A protein has these predicted regions:
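Conserved catalytic-core motifs of eukaryotic protein kinase domains, centered on the activation segment
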Residues: 1-4, 39-44, 96-99
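Conserved Rossmann-fold NAD(P)-dependent oxidoreductase catalytic core, especially the SDR/UDP-sugar
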Residues: 7, 11-59, 85
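Hydrophobic positions on the long internal alpha-helix
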Residues: 12, 16-20, 72-73, 145, ...
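Active-site Tyr-X1-5-Lys
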Residues: 17-18, 39, 48, 56-90, ...
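Active-site loop of short-chain dehydrogenase/reductase
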Residues: 24-28, 40, 81-83, 121-123, ...
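Glycine-rich "substrate-gating" loop/helix at the edge of Rossmann-like oxidoreductase active sites
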Residues: 58-62, 90-104, 128-140, 176-178
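C-terminal substrate-binding subdomain of Rossmann-fold SDR/epimerase-dehydratase oxidoreductases
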Residues: 116-252
Length: 252
């Protein structure tokens, strides 16, 4: 439903950004996504790779909506001096995530698989070879990064992050700067859940992009870095997962 998806996302962000502008909001932070970048990017992915290649077809509608939001913020700043900035987060996880069996992201999907397999004393089958590398950041780190950006990132200052041509960047990547293979991720989750059964890898299923890691050096130059390591974040997320089951608030 790419048309519906694109229409809804464009309406939401345009309404919010335009309303913020018209009502003299002092500063606006727009959140994009790492899917804005071309599917065949060099790694790690720098901000200036935006619009340098073809988008991943499965995420195209979402990516176009996010790119539109970035460019609208840029245009309002340029034409009207509206103070709007944007952050591009890496893959997020944490409390309130989506644990649906077919449309959840890889980390919450693995949490559900291993949790249910432990309770039912069954095996776990994961897609692909497990070799692709991905970056994951806890949502609490993103919250901290957003506050930091609003308080510390001044695009007009002499030390504002710039692209290779010396132009101030209007959006910055935010992440951990570290990636991990899907197989390693699965083993960490299995260990935290204390799953003792067998794990199989269905190599007939696609692996997807081999690596996707954001270059977060520009945001790091401002003095921010992630604080929650992956094992700690997974442990916290497992606690919220169990609590959401008990309180019947789990998104499935």
């Amino acid at each position: 439903y790419s048309a519906d998806f694109l229409l809804e996302n464009l309406k939401i962000e345009i309404n919010l950004i335009e309303s913020s502008f018209k009502n003299n909001v002092r500063r606006l932070l727009f959140l994009g996504s790492s899917c804005i970048y071309p599917k065949a990017c060099n790694q790690p992915i720098k901000e200036e790779y935006l619009l340098n290649g073809e988008l991943e077809s499965t995420n195209e509608a979402y990516a176009i909506a996010k790119i539109t939001g970035i460019k609208l913020c840029e245009s309002l700043r340029k034409q009207y001096d509206f103070d709007a900035i944007s952050l591009m987060p890496t893959n997020l996880y944490g409390p309130g995530d989506n644990y649906h069996q077919t449309n959840s992201h890889v980390l919450p999907s693995l949490i559900r698989k291993f949790s249910e397999a432990k309770k039912e004393n069954t095996t776990v089958t994961c897609w692909g070879t497990g070799s692709p590398l991905r970056e994951f950041m806890h949502v609490d780190d993103l919250g901290d990064a957003c506050v930091f950006a609003l308080e510390k990132w001044d695009m007009e200052s002499n030390n504002a992050p710039r692209d290779s041509k010396g132009k101030p960047l209007s959006f910055l990547n935010v992440g951990t700067g570290k990636d991990i293979s899907i197989k390693e991720l699965a083993l960490i989750i299995a260990a935290e859940i204390k799953f003792k059964g067998e794990i199989f890898w269905d190599v007939t299923k696609p692996d997807g992009t081999k690596r996707k890691l954001l270059d977060v050096n520009k945001f790091s130059e401002l003095g921010w870095e992630s604080k929650i390591d992956l094992k700690e974040g997974i442990k916290k997320t497992l606690g919220s997962y169990e609590n959401e089951i008990i309180t019947k608030n789990l998104r499935i």
